[in-house]
């Protein structure tokens, strides 16, 4: 066996005396803190929102609570293809599929439907991957942002609750 030649690629940056003692970093952090203090205390710009009297304004890209869409005839869009369940990194979605029988054919456009559809908001990380994976455009994260509750069962969304979050059935695409 021969010897291996090692070549040093990166050279180490020589720290100056003030970088060694972190005076520069401490001063930089104190300057940021001082700027925020001046804005809040002297200029009287408030940072805190008086919740629940005042509501926060959300951007158009805000990911709120999950909602399920219906098509133009008012039928459920979800065909229980399990795409959202498989792609969910937090494993927060549970779907149980059912076969469409003639009695409920008018409610579902396909042969299969979601008999049980649950999202556990305690596990959900609101990444939006379920929304992107849905081929039918059935699930969206455009619901309300306030989800505070004192009951853990309220944080498990069922299909029925997702369809009535914004005051009744939701028809059409995202605005």
From Swiss-Prot:
GO-annotated molecular function: 4 iron, 4 sulfur cluster binding; iron ion binding; NADH:ubiquinone reductase (non-electrogenic) activity; quinone binding
PROSITE patterns per the UniProt record, alphabetical: 4FE4S_FER_1, 4FE4S_FER_2
Keyword Protein transport annotated: no
GO biological process terms on file: aerobic respiration
Gene3D superfamilies for the chain: 3.30.70.3270
The protein's required cofactors: [4Fe-4S] cluster
Chain's role: NDH-1 shuttles electrons from NADH, via FMN and iron-sulfur (Fe-S) centers, to quinones in the respiratory chain. The immediate electron acceptor for the enzyme in this species is believed to be ubiquinone. Couples the redox reaction to proton translocation (for every two electrons transferred, four hydrogen ions are translocated across the cytoplasmic membrane), and thus conserves the redox energy in a proton gradient.
Lineage: Bacteria, Pseudomonadati, Spirochaetota, Spirochaetia, Leptospirales
Topology in the lipid bilayer: Peripheral membrane protein
Family annotation (NCBIfam families): NuoI (TIGR01971)
Self-association and partners: NDH-1 is composed of 14 different subunits. Subunits NuoA, H, J, K, L, M, N constitute the membrane sector of the complex.
Coiled coil: none
EC number: 7.1.1.-
Reaction catalyzed: a quinone + NADH + 5 H(+)(in) = a quinol + NAD(+) + 4 H(+)(out)
Broad enzyme group: translocase
GO cellular component: plasma membrane
Protein encoded by which gene: nuoI
Protein name: NADH-quinone oxidoreductase subunit I
């Amino acid at each position: 066996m021969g010897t291996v030649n090692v070549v040093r690629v990166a050279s180490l940056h020589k720290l100056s005396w003030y970088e060694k003692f972190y005076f520069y970093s401490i001063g930089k952090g104190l300057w940021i803190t001082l700027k925020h203090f001046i804005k809040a205390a002297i200029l009287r710009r408030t940072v805190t929102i008086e919740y629940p009297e005042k509501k926060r304004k959300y951007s158009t890209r805000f990911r709120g609570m999950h909602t399920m869409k219906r098509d133009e005839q008012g039928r459920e869009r979800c065909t229980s293809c399990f795409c959202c369940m498989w792609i969910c990194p937090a494993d927060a979605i549970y779907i149980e599929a059912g076969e469409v029988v003639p009695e409920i054919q008018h409610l579902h456009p396909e042969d299969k439907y979601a008999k049980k559809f649950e999202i556990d908001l305690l596990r959900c990380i609101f990444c939006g991957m379920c929304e992107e994976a849905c081929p039918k455009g059935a699930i969206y994260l455009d619901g309300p942002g306030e989800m505070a509750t004192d009951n853990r069962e309220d944080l498990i969304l069922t299909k029925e609750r997702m369809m009535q979050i914004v005051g009744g059935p939701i028809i059409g695409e995202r605005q």
